[in-house]
């Protein structure tokens, strides 16, 4: 079962702030999170049932540090569309 701890961050960028004005929240999660799991988390913890959830899997970037090659962690990003008129309290940039 999905848990609130699987949500790593709510993303705040220029693009996501524009989307928030249209009722779409962008969430970064662990790679094991599923669409249905995220819907359950939003219903249980935020009291809102999303009308639509889109997801994408993002590979971590390969970076160099002091001559050694490393890789950042992979993550999933979800675009959560809230129903018309629904909002989540204390969720603003």
From Swiss-Prot:
Family matches, as InterPro entries: Nucleotide-bd_a/b_plait_sf (IPR012677), Ribosomal_uL23-like (IPR013025), Ribosomal_uL23/eL15/eS24_sf (IPR012678)
Keyword rRNA-binding found: yes
A Pfam family assignment: Ribosomal_L23
Swiss-Prot/TrEMBL keywords: Ribonucleoprotein, Ribosomal protein, RNA-binding, rRNA-binding
Family recorded in the similarity comment: Belongs to the universal ribosomal protein uL23 family.
Subunit annotation: Part of the 50S ribosomal subunit. Contacts protein L29, and trigger factor when it is bound to the ribosome.
Identification of the protein by name: Large ribosomal subunit protein uL23
Annotated source species: Aliarcobacter butzleri (strain RM4018)
